[in-house]
Amino acid sequence: MQLMRFDKPIGTLLLLHPTLWALFAAAGGIPSSSILIIFILGVIVMRAAGCVINDYADRHIDGKVKRTSQRPLATGRVTTVEAKVLFFVLLIIAFLLDLSLNQYAFLLSFVAVALAVIYPFMKRFTHLPQVVLGMAFGWAIPMAYGAVIEDLPLTCWLLFLANILWTVAYDTQYAMVDRDDDLRIGVKSTAILFAQYDNKIIALLQFLSLILFILFGWLSEYHIGYFIVLALTSTLFIYQCWLTKQRVREQCFKAFLNNNYFGFGIFIAILVGIYGF
C-alpha cells in the first residue's frame, strides 16, 4: 500500500483533476458513466504504477534523502523483484482498462505508459524532470478528448499546456523541500536550476498557466462564470507564493499540497462555464 502511495492521495488527486477537466470539457457536460469510471480507475492504477517505478528507480538514493528514507524499497521491506512484479501487474490492469476505450484513446495510452516509465530516470540527466512529469500527468487530457470526441482540438492542447506549466510550478515547490539533499547527492530538479529565482519563476509559470486557462475558456465560449471562478481560484497562487517566500521546507510542502484546491477550482470553473450557473 505504501509503495503505491495509497496512504498519500495527493498525487492521485493532482492527476485526477486534469483528467476530469478534459472529460467534462470534451463532453460539454457530464461524460458517459462508462468512460468516467474507466478514467477514474485508470488514474488510480497508473498513479500507483508510477509510484512503484519511481521508487524502483530511486531505490539507491531514497535512503539518502530525509523525506524518502523510509520508503519500502529504500528500507528493504519490499524487494526489487516484488516491485517489478507489482509494476507489471498494474500495467496489465491499465491495459485491460484501455481496451474498453475506442482505438483513438487506446493508441494514445501508449504515450502515457512511456512517459510514466521514463519520468523517474530524468532527474539523472536533466534539471527539467518536472516538465516530463507535467506531460505524464497531463497526458490524460488528450486521451480524454480522444475517448469522448475522437479529436484533439486546440482547446485540448491549451488545457494540456496549461497543466504542464501548473505541474512544473507545483512540483518545483515540492522539489524545494528536497533541494539541500538533492544537491548533496547530485539529483537534478527545477528547484536547483532556478536557484535564487525559484519563487519568481514559479510565479511566472503560474501566471502563464492562467493565461492559457483564460484562452481555453474563451475558445470554448464558456459562460462568464468560468472566468469569475478562475479569478477566485487564482488567488491560491498568491497564497502559495507567500508560503514559499522564506523557502522553509514545511511551508514549501504546504504550498505544494494547496494545489489540490487549485485543481478542484478549475474543475468547478469548467462546470460553471458549461452550465452557466
Swiss-Prot record:
It is found in: Cell inner membrane. CDD domains: PT_UbiA_COQ2. It catalyses: all-trans-octaprenyl diphosphate + 4-hydroxybenzoate = 4-hydroxy-3-(all-trans-octaprenyl)benzoate + diphosphate. The chain crosses the membrane at residues 24-44, 81-101, 102-122, 129-149, 152-172, 201-221, 224-244, 255-275. Its cofactor is Mg(2+). Its EC number is 2.5.1.39. GO terms for biological process: ubiquinone biosynthetic process. Keywords: Cell inner membrane, Cell membrane, Magnesium, Membrane, Transferase, Transmembrane, Transmembrane helix, Ubiquinone biosynthesis. It holds the Pfam family UbiA. GO terms for cellular component: plasma membrane. GO terms for molecular function: 4-hydroxybenzoate polyprenyltransferase activity. Belongs to the UbiA prenyltransferase family. This is 4-hydroxybenzoate octaprenyltransferase. It comes from Haemophilus ducreyi (strain 35000HP / ATCC 700724).
